[in-house]
Amino acid sequence: MRNEQTVRIRLGIALLVAVTCALAAAAQDKNSFTPMALDSGFGHMDLAAPAVPPEQIIHQFAARESEFQQALNHYTFRRTARVQTIDDDNKVDGEWYEVDDVIFDPNGKRTEKVVYAPGSSLQRVQMSPSDLQDIQRGYSFALTTEEIAHYNVKYVGRQKVDEIDCYVFDVAPKVIEKKMRYLQGRIWVDATDLQIVVTNGRMVPDDTRKNNEDLHPPFMTWRQQVDGHYWFPVYTKGEGILHFSGGSGYMAQDVHIRDTVKYTDYKQFGSTFKIIYDGQEIAPPAEQPNAQQKK
């Protein structure tokens, strides 16, 4: 998310200066990150060591996440995203809204179709490419076997989430590479299905360079079982105060941001894809139910 004042200044100097500094080189204010608050559905955290070594749990759930990602890649769904700015009276004073269908073209290639996208009324901030990247991919984070090599994963404990027994892990990127987005935060993994059911954190990096700030709020994503086997993202909420520093020609500004993303209408595409769950082929369900969304 870019400060609208900063955007105006940058447009004025764009012909004079080429921004070549890599996003990965921007300094990160780690102390500014406050995760989303947990509701009453999160029970007591058991900090005792698990019966199974954490490394084994991590290996198993990463493999299951890979299976989930493969399954998700063969589903169509609708994504409804809303980004709002909130004033000092806790009222919405600007909004960006878009409805997209994630579908397949006639050649079977995965693509996105904009269903509805009214003009943005955001005044104090402007949507950046990284905001769109987070909405399209980051908020539905999956920690697969391929991705886990890029993360430090630390076992925290065991906790129930709405009666689901979960292992809890803290995750953070080992190295931030140019043009890449990573999760920094915490995940809850179903102790039976070994799949992520809740993600709480933020996507990094933030760009903190003056006249080029690009900041992002913390978020939580909930998953639910959609096909009877895998846990699919159904709802994301992000909220926080973005602290934009002052610069040449503009003042410092704090902007209250609220994001919501809903994922609905999951449907399996085609008939040639095989659902593999725990190493076994599963017959596809006759009908895909719409997952109930967490409010």
Residue spans of the language-model regions?
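Bacterial N-terminal signal peptides that target proteins for export
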Residues: 2-13
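Detector for intrinsically disordered, low-structure N-terminal pre-sequences
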Residues: 6, 16-18, 56, 124
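Bacterial N-terminal signal peptides
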Residues: 12-22
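Sec/Tat signal peptide C-region and signal peptidase I cleavage site
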Residues: 23-27
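Structured extracytoplasmic
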Residues: 28-184, 191-198, 202-217, 225-233, ...
